[in-house]
């Protein structure tokens, strides 16, 4: 599949969700940790959360991770004033290893507003672009290649399991029939139109767009998002000092269920947020994306 143009980082606007809540949680750590501690920002994005942390805690250093080259470029520009207090690494957090210990690991999961708003990335069904959806546009197979290679049965299973889409069988049948009869879709809106046709007319204009769950499923599969999350949940507690915080922000139930279960069953961690922390009504009004966010926080136990 021919790639679309790689967008500039200049428009990479990452609005940090629940920034105040994250800063407040860090302020509740023992002062000896925040005076000179290390934080791992596992999904640095445009650098929004890291900037807030570095501004509020002058002694803290951050290692920021991101597999998206545009995100890293944008974060580098935003955070350049902090000098050696910030180090940005090109990697998926699932592949990261740490030789020292941190006071906090922060992961803001999912797709960023910029990735959704940039047509060339192929994440959005509202803006036409190549059916790509890769977090790293230079690695792996695109969503277009995925739907071409999967069987109808496997595609239906994927849409059902990763998108929780009840019409997965009908959607998969439509996609595979279209590909067989007409060849590849011209772009994301062409695919979205085909998906919407699998719904009754009255359901095509509801609060949730008909393509939402299918596009979510394809994106999760293309980027192995759940596999990467499982790896992070297993590895991150080992990176933490005693009392260090593990904060994970998720945006859909598949992620949140895994985070909740892992925090509850991992004997290295103590759950600090019995229920997920949600964005305030004021924040939701300013940043609608924050409405679906759930922040869970745990702390590293002292293990004898």
Curated annotation (Swiss-Prot):
S-adenosyl-L-methionine binds at residues 47-49, 66, 93, 108, 115. CDD domains: AdoMet_MTases. Keywords: Cytoplasm, Methyltransferase, rRNA processing, S-adenosyl-L-methionine, Transferase. Disulfide bonds: none annotated. GO terms for cellular component: cytoplasm. It catalyses: cytidine(1402) in 16S rRNA + S-adenosyl-L-methionine = N(4)-methylcytidine(1402) in 16S rRNA + S-adenosyl-L-homocysteine + H(+). It comes from Prochlorococcus marinus (strain NATL1A). InterPro entries: RsmH, SAM-dep_MeTrfase_MraW_recog, SAM-dependent_MTases_sf. It holds the Pfam family Methyltransf_5. This is Ribosomal RNA small subunit methyltransferase H. Specifically methylates the N4 position of cytidine in position 1402 (C1402) of 16S rRNA.
């Amino acid at each position: 599949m021919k790639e679309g143009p790689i967008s500039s980082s200049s428009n990479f606007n990452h609005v940090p969700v629940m920034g105040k809540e994250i800063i407040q949680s860090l302020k509740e750590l023992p002062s000896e940790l925040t005076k000179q501690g290390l934080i791992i920002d596992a999904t640095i994005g445009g650098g929004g959360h890291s900037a807030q942390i570095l501004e509020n805690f002058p002694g803290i250093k951050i290692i920021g991770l991101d597999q998206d080259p545009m995100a890293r470029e944008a974060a580098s520009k935003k955070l350049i004033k902090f000098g050696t207090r910030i180090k940005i690494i090109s990697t998926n957090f699932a592949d990261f290893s740490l030789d020292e210990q941190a006071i906090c690991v922060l992961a803001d999961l999912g797709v960023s507003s910029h990735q959704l708003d940039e047509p060339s990335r192929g994440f959005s069904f509202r803006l036409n672009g190549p059916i790509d959806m890769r977090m790293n546009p230079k690695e792996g197979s695109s969503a277009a290649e995925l739907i071409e290679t999967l069987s109808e049965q496997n595609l239906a299973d994927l849409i059902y399991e990763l998108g929780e889409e009840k019409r997965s069988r009908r959607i998969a049948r439509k996609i595979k029939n279209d590909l067989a009869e007409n060849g590849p879709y011209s772009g994301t809106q062409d695919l979205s139109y085909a998906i919407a046709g699998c719904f009754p007319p009255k359901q095509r204009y509801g609060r949730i767009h008909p393509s939402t769950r299918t596009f979510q499923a394809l994106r999760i599969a293309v980027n192995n998002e759940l596999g990467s999350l499982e790896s992070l949940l297993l590895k991150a507690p080992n990176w933490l000092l005693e009392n260090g915080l593990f904060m994970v922000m998720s945006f859909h139930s598949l992620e949140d269920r895994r985070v909740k279960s892992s925090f509850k069953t991992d004997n290295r961690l103590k759950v600090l947020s019995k229920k997920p922390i949600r964005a305030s009504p004021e924040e939701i009004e300013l940043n609608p994306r924050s409405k679906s966010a759930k922040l869970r926080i745990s702390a590293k136990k002292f293990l004898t």
